[in-house]
């Protein structure tokens, strides 16, 4: 079946075979039955319908809301009188595979909106779907006795859906609104081949071992406390050391690249957010409070807790007259921001409500944009190479909800493309994926087990300088509007540390590891020698630990190795008498001895990393 065509690409969109036939367009680019992203989108969307068909046969009272394909699979939101749990997934999956083997054709037909209302008159979930459709007719996809409202696209036959796996049952509010009823959401995945499915499931098992939430607890790096608040991470001592090492590395890297450190407040008057447009375009993601007015006769004034750092940087630029000779002017801030996320999407450090960005804003002339974006891209490359990440980039263009003229958007988008083209970098296009105030380059990294993560962004903004009326004086003594480039390379420290934790499975490289080595004295006679080495390293801000409890030697060694430090150092009589250390090297997976001086110099050198 790998040579079978299951759909087509038309104007960068995926359409199914029946839709292509209806359009009557020839020479379309075919989508073959394989594990390409386009093919998997078709397969997974259809697998969601196959799951719904199986559930309908097993639970005849089942009602379905929506069932899209998502990045790594699919889901369907539904409700049944009898609750469905993870234990039921095996039986549903068995039914799905039986239906797939029947090779049932998947067909589309159309009915009017009125007919659809009548057809689904007893199904409140379908009525909710119809409420979202502003068209005179709707499409329905049918396979056997099962049919559902859907825009498509779908594969032409269930025979293409034999490699499926249901993964978990969760809850989801109808339409994502917590005021509505809770539905059952079932997640699954599907591939074209059995081998690809097995490889993906194997990766998921490895991902469980690397889960940063699990490792963060085991290594005592960070915690969450519901009494403090969901999505608000608390950094424990070792986690703070880890984060501090990363911050120091990036801070010095910015200074060497002629960025100037700045710091803005956490609270800004809502007046500022109204000028910027965030108040009208981003308000649902912000937190607000009120502060009493200095004049007791006036009402309290509304303030917004910043969801991003850019406004203070704009004000810093505009607080005095700027000359063209100062440009480009690069400000950076490790700024803490707050953004409202629904509780259902919070996920460890990857998705939080409070986080700190490696934020920078570059103010430059129009003719400096490409050069500045190139410098940022080179900065990105230095960071990704240092941490061993492969990465890809994607330009996100103007979304439906946006501000600014077409001319400004085109100019900004072309500047990003120009920089990438000059560096001969491959990039994708995400149509409509830009922020409301400008196009951007998204940086997506690939970790050690092949997962892709969204991290940093580079964004050209002609809009905020206009809104805040900031200027510089050009060589002709004329006021000119600067261009503003927003950029965050790692995105946020929280998210990047989560990704690093899973990428390295908790075995951080020495230069950012919170604890560089653990000394295990064989008995109390060897503790002072360990303390001498520890003190010498501490003079260079290098943190180590000594495991000198009353536990057995083997237990202390095991406990030290569980901390995933690079070096467990055993100290006994021979080491003390000869100024040696016995090293268990985690990365090399070997044991060897060094002189005390050699060990100290080795650790110092490993920590002397620059970007």
Predicted features, each with a name:
Residues 1-65, 70-611:
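NTP/phosphate- and nucleic-acid-binding module
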């Amino acid at each position: 079946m790998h040579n079978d065509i299951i759909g087509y690409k038309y104007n960068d969109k995926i359409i199914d075979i029946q839709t292509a036939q209806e359009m009557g367009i020839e020479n379309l680019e075919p989508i073959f039955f394989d594990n390409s992203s386009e093919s998997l989108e078709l397969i997974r969307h259809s697998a969601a319908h196959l799951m719904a068909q199986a559930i309908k046969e097993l639970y005849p009272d089942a009602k379905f809301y929506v069932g899209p394909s998502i990045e790594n699979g699919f889901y369907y939101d539904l409700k049944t009188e009898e609750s469905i749990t993870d234990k039921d997934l095996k039986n549903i999956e068995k039914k799905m595979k039986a239906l797939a083997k029947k090779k049932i054709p998947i067909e589309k037909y159309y009915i009017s909106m009125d007919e659809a209302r009548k057809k689904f008159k007893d199904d409140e979930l379908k009525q909710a779907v119809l409420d979202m459709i502003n068209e005179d007719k709707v499409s329905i996809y049918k396979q056997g006795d099962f049919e559902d409202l859907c825009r498509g696209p779908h594969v032409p036959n269930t025979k293409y859906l034999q490699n499926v796996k249901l993964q978990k049952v969760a809850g989801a509010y109808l339409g994502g609104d917590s005021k509505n009823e809770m539905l059952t959401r079932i997640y699954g995945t599907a591939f074209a081949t059995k081998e690809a499915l097995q490889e993906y499931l194997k990766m998921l098992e490895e991902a469980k071992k690397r889960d940063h939430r699990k490792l963060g607890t085991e290594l005592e790096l960070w915690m969450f406390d519901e009494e403090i608040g969901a999505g608000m991470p608390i950094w424990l001592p070792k986690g703070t050391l880890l984060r501090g090492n990363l911050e120091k590395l990036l801070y010095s890297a910015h200074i060497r690249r002629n960025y100037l450190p700045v710091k803005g407040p956490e609270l800004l008057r809502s007046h500022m957010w109204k000028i910027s447009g965030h108040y009208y375009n981003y308000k649902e993601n912000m937190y607000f409070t009120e502060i009493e007015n200095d004049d007791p006769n006036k009402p309290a004034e509304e303030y917004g807790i910043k969801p991003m750092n850019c406004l203070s940087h704009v004000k810093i630029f505009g607080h005095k007259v700027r000359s063209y000779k100062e440009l480009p002017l690069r400000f950076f801030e490790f700024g803490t921001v707050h953004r409202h996320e629904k509780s259902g999407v919070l996920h460890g450090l990857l998705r939080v409500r409070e986080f700190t960005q490696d934020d920078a804003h570059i103010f430059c002339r129009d003719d400096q944009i490409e050069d500045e974006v190139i410098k940022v891209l080179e900065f990105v490359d230095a960071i990704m190479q240092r941490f061993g990440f492969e990465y890809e980039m994607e330009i996100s263009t103007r979304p439906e909800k946006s501000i600014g003229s077409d001319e400004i958007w085109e100019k900004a988008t072309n500047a990003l493309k120009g920089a990438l083209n000059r560096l001969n970098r491959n990039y994708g296009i995400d149509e409509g994926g830009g922020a409301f105030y400008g196009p951007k380059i998204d940086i997506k990294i690939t970790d050690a087990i092949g997962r892709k993560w969204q991290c940093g962004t580079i964004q050209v903004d002609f809009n905020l300088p206009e809104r805040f009326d900031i200027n510089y004086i050009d060589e002709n003594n004329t006021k000119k509007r600067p261009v503003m480039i927003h950029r965050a390379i790692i995105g946020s420290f929280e998210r990047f540390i989560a990704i690093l934790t899973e990428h390295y499975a908790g075995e951080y490289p020495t230069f950012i590891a919170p604890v560089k080595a653990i000394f295990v004295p064989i008995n109390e006679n060897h503790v002072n020698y360990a303390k001498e080495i520890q003190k010498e390293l501490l003079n260079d801000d290098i943190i180590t630990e000594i495991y000198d409890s009353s536990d057995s030697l083997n237990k202390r060694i095991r406990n030290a190795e569980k901390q995933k430090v690079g070096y467990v150092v055993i100290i006994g009589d021979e080491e003390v008498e000869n100024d040696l250390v016995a090293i268990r090297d985690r990365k090399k997976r070997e044991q060897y001895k060094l002189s005390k001086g050699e060990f100290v110099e080795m650790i110092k050198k490993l920590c002397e990393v620059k970007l």
